[in-house]
């Protein structure tokens, strides 16, 4: 449904500290590495040279801001409620302190709600503007959005994971399942959600 499409779009625009492989194993993404310091402290070394879609470089300040923003959000804080605080310990290191030992921390830090956002851009423009004009560090940047109709994404050449092979992604809202089937059969669509 709508949620799966929103998650698909978000995972193209944004990146998280961790990602989960097809086997369900957490792997570093925007984090270069991590280590558990004790039962309630996890250190993350942040990947250097990562760019947001506006060309600015991601910093540990953006990471702390993004996690603090998620904690403060009544909509998504359940994903990060285990976090006591985020401490910047170096130019590219942070320590996440948890309220108590929390085993699924790495998985939770791969959930799209924990995406790293550009602090200065969000603070300057506000949450409402950011929701309509998002920029992240993901493989695609949003170039056009027609609410209720379509979203057009374009490959981000400076993506830290390498330039995506597909140049453009267009996601269209097609309310009728039968129309989605026809779009697949005629080749108008490459992927369709909720066909049955």
Listing of model-derived features with the role each one plays in the protein:
Residues 1, 5, 32, 41-44, ...:
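Short, well-ordered beta-strand elements
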Residues 1-38, 68, 135:
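N-terminal lobe/hinge region of extracytoplasmic solute-binding protein
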Residues 12, 29-31, 37-41, 58, ...:
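Extracytoplasmic
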Residues 18, 22, 39, 51, ...:
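Sec-exported extracytoplasmic/periplasmic mature domains
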Residues 21, 25, 111-164, 168:
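Gly/Pro-rich hinge or "lid" segments in bacterial periplasmic/extracellular proteins
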Residues 32-74, 89, 95, 183:
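Aromatic- and charge-enriched surface segment that lines or borders ligand/interaction sites
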Residues 35, 78-121:
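Surface-exposed binding/hinge segments that line
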Residues 156-196:
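Ligand-site clamp/hinge motif
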